[in-house]
Amino acid sequence: MIGFEIFLAIGMFTAIVLGLVAIILVARAKLVSSGDVTIQINGEHSLTVPAGGKLLQTLAANNVFLSSACGGGGTCAQCKCVVVEGGGEMLPTEESHFTRRQAKEGWRLSCQTPVKQDMQIRVPEEVFGVKKWECTVESNPNVATFIKELTLRLPDGESVDFRAGGYVQLECPPHVVEYKDFDIQPEYRGDWDKFNMWRYVSKVDETVIRAYSMANYPEEKGVVKFNIRIASPPPGSDLPPGQMSSWVFNLKPGDKVTVYGPFGEFFAKDTEAEMVFIGGGAGMAPMRSHIFDQLRRLKSNRKISFWYGARSLREAFYTEEYDQLQAENPNFQWHLALSDPQPEDNWTGLTGFIHNVLFENYLKDHPAPEDCEFYMCGPPMMNAAVIKMLTDLGVERENILLDDFGG
């Protein structure tokens, strides 16, 4: 009798386990996609892909690269596309990035959209011109205390077909980087010592992707050049240092860097209007690209001025290049303003924050600032101050173009 009860108990237990397994398998079949699905793109291109991933990564695996400065985290909202069919309902993580009208039209963040069934999507046509390269670090010196000029050499015979003001994405692998190993030139080490920057360590467990504007212009072939500022934690905080910028600061000539691009929307308008460029910090990069493109490649006759703000002369770079451009082009003037000139600078030029300098020394007496086009890139506080000043002068928002790298 006891043996029968044991046998019965074992049988019932086995039946329960098999039943649970069956339920799990049925649920998995319902909830987890498997097999292949088809993605129709713009009604012209078709991909057959495995189901189960996110749309952004699935497209990238098939050499269709949407911009994603946050690397698929759902925060930058650059990987937008229109999902005509498939993809399921919009997720809560996407809702804040779209208006109700856009949501009805099918706009989605591709990094949040699951690939579970056949889909039809629309993406910008320029996406099909985006490529991927493994580049080699040519040089990576400091050009300011906390800014590196990273120059990457493309593979032989390759070029980036981009417009001035465009950007690419850099990919950095998992790493452990110690700031004490950085190669910082002697003239910039004082502030690194003062703020004890050497104590930081960057530890990254997953691949990180970030977007950076290019400092070169289209006729500077074979390379891509960037101005990248180290993203150190605010004083007194326990926040980790910037993942990508820490890795970039540790790069040495000969190191390999994966690059995707080009992308962009911070492009010059094709008009004859006066162009006023305003920059600060690492916002120099797209300013240089635009100004060199206008004067060196396009031979533009438009009236162009550039207003750049730096803390001291040590933080100003490319000054000789702009001096040369100004000497060669009567339609171009550039102005450097220092907010905190040091005694050794012996500075007799413009001083103050760049939005005040621009207003007091130019726009205050300009006959029609509302007819100018303003292109800017710099720290968020600078951008906000300049935009307020311009709108107070009656400049329409469509004539204020911003490369908002600072969030």
Curated annotation (Swiss-Prot):
Gene Ontology, cellular component aspect: plasma membrane
Secretion signal, residue range per the UniProt entry: none
Enzyme class: translocase
InterPro entries assigned to the protein according to its UniProt record, in alphabetical order: 2Fe-2S_ferredoxin-like_sf, 2Fe-2S_ferredoxin-type, Beta-grasp_dom_sf, Cbr1-like_FAD-bd_dom, FAD-bd_FR_type, FNR_nucleotide-bd, NqrF, OxRdtase_FAD/NAD-bd
Intracellular or extracellular location(s): Cell inner membrane
CDD domains in the record: fer2 (cd00207), NADH_quinone_reductase (cd06188)
Ranges for domain FAD-binding FR-type: 130-269
Name of the molecule in the record: Na(+)-translocating NADH-quinone reductase subunit F
Organism per entry: Pseudomonas aeruginosa (strain ATCC 15692 / DSM 22644 / CIP 104116 / JCM 14847 / LMG 12228 / 1C / PRS 101 / PAO1)
